[in-house]
Amino acid sequence: MAPAEKAFVLRKKMDTAIEDRPGQTLTDDHQVKVAIKATGICGSDVHYWKEGGIGDFILKKPMILGHESAGVVVEVGKGVSSLKPGDPVAVEPGCVCRLCDYCRSGRYNLCPHMEFAATPPYDGTLRTYYITTEDFCTKLPKQISVEEGALFEPMSVAVHAMTRGNLKCGSRVLVMGCGTVGLLMMAVAKAYGAIDIVAVDASPSRVEFAQKYVGAKPFTPIAAKENESLPDYAQRYKQAIIEKYGEFDFAVDATGVGICIHTAVLALKRGGTFVQAGNGKPVIDFPINHIINYEINVLGSFRYAHGCYKQSLFLVSNGLVDVKPLITHRFAFKDALKAYETVASGEEGVLKVIIGGPDA
């Protein structure tokens, strides 16, 4: 019998505990067991903790949190050929069927049978060991730490958004939101040849970080007038941006906030591309006539698909994107709740918070 493990468990809304969980054993020849050494905290993790659910995904029983993880392989199935015990890996936190049309076309993020870590009812990665399949692990070279490997998950979100929008070299790019994902979108856009990147966020420290991190040009959101309609506000907001920086070829929203989305669409050139990557309200006002008349390409971007982790590995290992500056806080596993409280505080200067493994 496998030894017991430690796990950071969400028992119910705002109720967490470090628990002993039964040890796990491999059940398939192509599985690997990974000792988790570093886990980043995502906004969705905090939302589950604070609200007990996201949309249709409602916590109905205790769930292990975490999905941005990396660690070291400790055991492999007899069918595993590309990994061995001792290999450091970034863990892709979804399990798919591999049989549906979406999986077979490489768009496995759309698999209707997806089992995604720390999405009810499936347990996450904040535990001693996580069992997954060989092909959902990305081996890390010596120059990349497991902390950097943990950031491959949000970076793959950024890679997928740029890929969905078919970002062209020489594009002028507008990014709404300077959280970790928004900053990584800027970094990936720069690596892909964007010539101008404008960063928009209400947080002065985050906009300043974007300037230093990728050379982004800053823009601070303008305030709405009293009783001003959202379309009128968006028109003023857009005008303020383009008077300073001109129109854009490509815009991406990482906030999910209605005014940011509306404004970003309006700030595009005719024939421009808008990618929505941030979750928000289920229904918002959208400038549909503008989209039609300007032939704006509007795309949704959900998580990541085939090749995104490998592309993240390429960008980081070749020095095209540096994820290390994004890590602002580190906590031991025993202090996982403090880590969540730090992210939830919304304090200036907090970007990516990393929790070490139980035996790190």
Swiss-Prot record:
Disulfide bonds: none annotated. Gene3D superfamilies: Medium-chain alcohol dehydrogenases, catalytic domain (3.90.180.10), NAD(P)-binding Rossmann-like Domain (3.40.50.720). GO terms for molecular function: D-xylulose reductase activity; L-iditol 2-dehydrogenase (NAD+) activity; zinc ion binding. Substrate binds at residues 48, 153, 303-304. It catalyses: keto-D-fructose + NADH + H(+) = D-sorbitol + NAD(+). Keywords: Metal-binding, NAD, Oxidoreductase, Zinc. Its EC number is 1.1.1.-. The keyword NAD applies. InterPro entries: ADH-like_C, ADH-like_N, ADH_Zn_CS, GroES-like_sf, NAD(P)-bd_dom_sf, PKS_ER, SDH-like. The keyword NAD applies. Its cofactor is Zn(2+). It comes from the Eukaryota. One of its GO terms (biological process) is sorbitol catabolic process. NAD(+) binds at residues 201, 206, 277-279, 301-303. Binds 1 zinc ion per subunit. Zn(2+) binds at residues 42, 67-68. Pfam families: ADH_N, ADH_zinc_N. One of its GO terms (cellular component) is cytosol. Polyol dehydrogenase that catalyzes the reversible NAD(+)-dependent oxidation of various sugar alcohols. Is active with D-sorbitol (D-glucitol) as substrate, leading to the C2-oxidized product D-fructose. Suppresses growth arrest induced by a p53 tumor mutant in fission yeast. Homotetramer. Belongs to the zinc-containing alcohol dehydrogenase family. This is Sorbitol dehydrogenase.
